[in-house]
Structures are given as structure tokens and as C-alpha cells.
């Protein structure tokens, strides 16, 4: 069954059809929330609230655009609200800390490599979070969520040219922030 059929069934009150739509989009919505909110529990709550808002607004959805595009628009607006309510306080989860059960040379090397990878990811996410919102949103949708330009254009209600130029600026700003941060640490890191 295609997405349009699922949407129509959900609009007609089919709980199973809506649950299937949730299943199809749950990981993408959660991932989007997580990339902005950076706290697993808060991102999970936000994702659930996005689906609740979508469910309540479903009768107003007219299938003129893709369901995913409509849902991402709801998600972006809700995530902005969550961040405004939190006062943009950044939360960093320490769930990445793992204990080694067997201490040997290979395990230590692997743990060091994982920590380095996590540190790099954390640095990139931290720099992304410091970008102005209009650039952070586009960078997240394209480079983290992997949405195509035309879908980003629809979600954000802007021309593909504007999406392209803002994405270019966002990437340049991110490179500058990363270079500045790495320069402060001695510049010996490779990204």
C-alpha cells in the first residue's frame, strides 16, 4: 500500500494506517529531533508530540504535497517551539561512556578510536548548534537527514536556489567554526 492510500485510510479513521505511517517516519523524525535537541529523552518526547500534532491535523492535510514533507514541516515547527521553551539550553548526554569488560591492547585501541569518533561527532554537532537557525536547519535537513533539495525547498517554503545558497553558506560557516576550534586545540586533528 502506498503512502497516499495510507494517508487516506488514516484520514478516514484507520488507526492501523496511521500506525504504519508512524512506523515509516518514526526514525527520521526522531533523528531530526535528536540532531537539534541533543537529548535522547527530550527528542523522543518531541517526536511523539510531532506525531500527535500530525494525527490531530491529518483531516486538514489535502495530499497536495508529500506526507513526508508535511510531517517534516510540523517537526521543524515543533522542534523550534521546544528549543524556544528550553531557552536554547544545550543538553549533552553522557550515555556514550562505556566500560570495557576485557582490557587488552585491541580493546583499548578500539575504545580510543570510538572515543575519538564520538568526540569528532560531538565537535561537529556542537559547531552545527552554534550556526544561525536558518543555516542550521538547512544543513541538518540536507547533510544529516539526507533530504533532497526539492523536498527541503517545499518544507521550508523557499526556492531551490535559496536552499542551495544557504546550504553553501552553512557549510562554509561550519568549516570556519571547525577550523577555528581545531586551531585552538593545536590543529593536529584530521576531520
Model-derived features: positions:
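Short, charged helix-capping/linker segments at alpha-helix termini
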Residues: 11-20, 30-49, 137, 160, ...
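Short, Lys/Arg-enriched C-terminal cap helix and immediately downstream tail that follows
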Residues: 84-87, 131, 136, 171-191
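N-terminal module of bacterial RNA polymerase sigma factors
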Residues: 1-28, 35, 129, 151, ...
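Sigma70-family region 2
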Residues: 11-12, 38-39, 51-66, 85-86
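DNA-recognition helix of helix-turn-helix
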Residues: 76, 80, 135, 144, ...
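Internal acidic/polar
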Residues: 3, 89-114, 148
Amino acid at each position: 500500500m502506498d503512502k497516499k492510500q495510507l494517508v487516506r485510510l488514516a484520514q478516514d479513521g484507520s488507526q492501523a494506517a496511521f500506525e504504519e505511517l508512524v512506523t515509516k517516519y518514526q526514525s527520521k523524525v526522531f533523528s531530526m529531533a535528536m540532531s537539534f535537541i541533543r537529548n535522547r529523552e527530550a527528542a523522543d518526547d518531541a517526536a511523539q508530540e510531532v506525531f500527535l500534532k500530525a494525527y490531530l491535523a491529518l483531516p486538514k492535510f489535502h495530499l497536495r504535497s508529500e506526507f513526508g514533507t508535511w510531517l517534516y514541516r510540523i517537526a521543524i515547527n515543533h522542534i523550534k517551539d521546544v528549543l524556544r521553551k528550553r531557552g536554547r539550553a544545550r543538553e549533552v548526554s553522557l550515555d556514550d561512556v562505556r566500560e570495557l569488560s576485557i582490557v587488552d591492547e585491541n580493546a583499548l585501541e578500539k575504545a580510543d578510536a570510538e572515543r575519538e569518533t564520538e568526540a569528532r561527532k560531538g565537535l561537529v554537532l556542537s559547531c552545527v548548534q552554534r550556526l544561525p537557525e536558518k543555516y542550521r536547519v538547512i544543513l541538518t535537513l540536507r547533510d544529516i537527514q539526507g533530504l533532497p533539495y526539492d523536498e527541503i525547498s517545499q518544507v521550508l517554503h523557499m526556492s531551490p536556489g535559496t536552499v542551495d545558497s544557504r546550504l553553501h553558506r552553512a557549510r562554509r560557516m561550519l568549516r570556519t567554526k571547525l577550523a577555528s576550534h581545531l586551531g585552538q586545540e593545536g590543529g593536529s586533528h584530521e576531520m
